[in-house]
Amino acid sequence: MINGLGRMKNWLWIIGLFFVLSLHAEDGHRFWLRMERNALPADVSLSESTERTATLDIASRELKDFWKGEGRVLLRVSKDGVMRDGFTICRKGLDVELSSASDNGVLYAAYDLLRRQQAGDLLSDGVAVTERPSYDIRILNHWDNPDGTVERGYAGRSIWKWDELPETVSPLYEEYARANASVGINAVVLNNVNAKPQMLSTGMLRKVAVIAEVLRPYGIRTYLSVNFASPKALGELSTADPLDEDVQRWWKKKAKEIYRLIPDFGGFLVKANSEGEPGPQDYGRTHADGANMLADVLAPYGGLVMWRAFVYQAESPDRACQAYEEFMPFDGQFRDNVIVQVKNGPIDFQPREPFSPLFGAMQHTQVMPEFQITQEYLGQSIHTVFLATMWKDCLDAETYRVGGGTVADVTQHRVGIHSRSAVAGVAN
């Protein structure tokens, strides 16, 4: 009897072991899109006035695969629809209509409808809901290097396989694009702000163009971090002085090359004269001189310059004041297609610090907040931290500028005729 019980326990252990081995942990690849694919496609169609595009094909495919509703889903792009990537979802009986002024807006509406389905928050008959993003540009900054390493990266190596591109295109690129589009991200910077000059070589730009082609149908524009000394570092000029005519011609030629390969290229992110990175101050010039030179080069193509205000240098007597002291004298002197990108705090993504005074002080320059998603000072890959509360504290903080306004208010406001509002997140 005792031997029989022992054998039974052994078998139970073996069965339990096989059961454990058959379990599969969530690997994160499905993101929030953990939906079972339909056995038969849902009824999804475009309105008669809506032309088929690659972006609308994605919206249609997502709904056909995962929408469980019994009625028809109609996708409509209309010039009188909600602007700035906004959308309206309207329920009429069993049918649902998704409308926007842009293809991207319809794609965001499709993901919002699926989110509501997942959350059990479906609209009642006759009810319509309209959503508008607060910022024109919702951009991720990746600090990825050409060799595959990631600065302040705590989630493995870079997904950009530069050594395989342009011949081999990883399926992760589209998976990445889908995840971003599903939460409204519409722009990405592919490489580290401590940029290698080689990122602007013709060979690398051809590889960037392949990634941009994958991201484009998901409504995502591609940006690059650039090394300000690239004309000199690549051995083509003896200087990188932004007021030198040869330097200006070099950048114009490079911009022409980029837009020939990537017609919807977003623009440049620049870290200059900070932590040893080169910049216009190396030649006695100002941040405005450097940013405006690049802005003039990109302006004919609709490109932007995001010029970082993180200008920490060890010789500064007060690190918390340095960005304010270097940028405030030039408020109002930046081109309309320049956005000064300001870290949420005056130091460096600290767990607790006040918001940067530049948000309220620079009233004549477009500024944008830069938040850190990768947890450099908050446990890195070890701890799970709910970051949204910290960001909300910053965005909701009153700046006490003339006329009042929170950080969110002043950064969502467009300063110039051609300005665009933006918010950045530094991601693994």
Model-derived regions: residue spans:
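N-terminal secretory signal peptides that target proteins for export/translocation
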Residues: M1-M8
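Active-site-proximal beta-alpha loop/turn segments in soluble metabolic enzymes
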Residues: K196-P197, K232-D241, K271-D282, F310, ...
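Feature activates predominantly on carbohydrate-active enzymes
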Residues: D27, E62, M83-G86, R91-L269, ...
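Acidic, contiguous N-terminal accessory segments
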Residues: I14, A25-G93, S124-G126
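Substrate-binding groove of N-acetylhexosamine-processing glycoside hydrolases
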Residues: R260, P278, R285-N428
